[in-house]
UniProtKB/Swiss-Prot annotation:
This is 3-deoxy-manno-octulosonate cytidylyltransferase. The gene is kdsB. The keyword Methyltransferase does not apply. It comes from Trichlorobacter lovleyi (strain ATCC BAA-1151 / DSM 17278 / SZ) (Geobacter lovleyi). Its main location: cytoplasm. Activates KDO (a required 8-carbon sugar) for incorporation into bacterial lipopolysaccharide in Gram-negative bacteria. One of its GO terms (biological process) is CMP-keto-3-deoxy-D-manno-octulosonic acid biosynthetic process. It is found in: Cytoplasm.
Length: 252
């Protein structure tokens, strides 16, 4: 089975322009993401997909693979699909270009349900919410799943709504697991052929309402397998996030 990881990376981030090339422990951030990705044992090949020559040059200089893509894509999925069309691959893994601390084991965990399961079209990860701030924050996407580990819904709202335990909404309740809630970890795995279909689907009501692309799949009746991970990554959306990543790396 040919499994290719694609890392979409733009230079023109709204909140943090140039973040893909921001220095993190002596390396551009995108280099950290690429190096962590190729360490995943189930990944056959890793490619950075970018619309900026500077990002491609960084990857080429370390002997990696980067492909220049159109500057007109509205979403990361569109950029992913452009590259996937030209690949001879069975499975495509979408690794976010702003996750320099991603553990290779997380990538393997997301891929594993696809091994020997040709009917599975899309998968992702979740991890425990451990504080009240994350539960309430619209910037932390929550997910609920059925008893078989398939997504029921993703939302920026508190999910689930603990109607009879609202007075118990404290950090300790989440940290101890007394209130069990999960946040979405934005790493996706697709059957290649399904990815191309998915990218061509019109945007949907819930997707546009929540600004969450994965809802397009749910609204079209596609089951999304969600695997729980205990590994903690860190998305870098702002300079402050970059400083947090630097501190995490110092701590080992």
């Amino acid at each position: 089975m040919q499994i290719v990881a694609i890392i979409p990376a733009r230079y023109g981030s709204t909140r943090f322009p140039g973040k893909a090339l921001a220095d993190l422990a002596g390396k551009p951030m995108i280099q950290h993401v690429y190096e962590q990705t190729i360490r995943a044992s189930l990944v056959s090949r890793a490619i950075v997909a970018t619309d900026d020559r500077r990002i491609a040059d960084v990857i080429h200089q370390i002997g990696g693979e980067a492909i220049m893509t159109s500057t007109d894509h509205e979403t990361g999925t569109d950029r992913l699909a452009e590259v996937a069309r030209g690949l001879d691959a069975d499975i495509i893994v979408n690794v976010q270009g702003d996750e320099p601390l991603i553990d290779p084991a997380m990538i393997n965990q997301a891929i594993e349900p696809f091994l020997g399961n040709p009917g599975l079209k899309m998968g992702t990860l979740k991890s425990r919410v451990k504080c009240l701030h994350d539960f309430l924050s619209p910037n932390v996407v929550k997910v609920v799943t059925d008893n078989n580990g398939y997504a029921l819904y993703f939302s920026r709202s508190p999910l689930p709504f603990f109607r009879d335990k609202w007075q118990d909404l404290k950090d300790e309740a989440f940290a101890s697991g007394r209130l069990l809630c999960f946040k979405h970890v934005g790493l996706y795995v697709y059957q290649r052929n399904f990815l191309l279909e998915y990218a061509a689907m019109p945007q949907t009501f819930l997707e546009l309402s929540e600004k969450l692309e994965q809802l397009r799949a749910l609204e079209n009746g596609i089951r999304i397998r969600v695997v729980e991970t205990e590994f903690e990554s860190l998305g870098v959306d702002t300079p402050d996030d970059l400083n947090k990543a630097k501190e995490r790396m110092k701590q080992g």
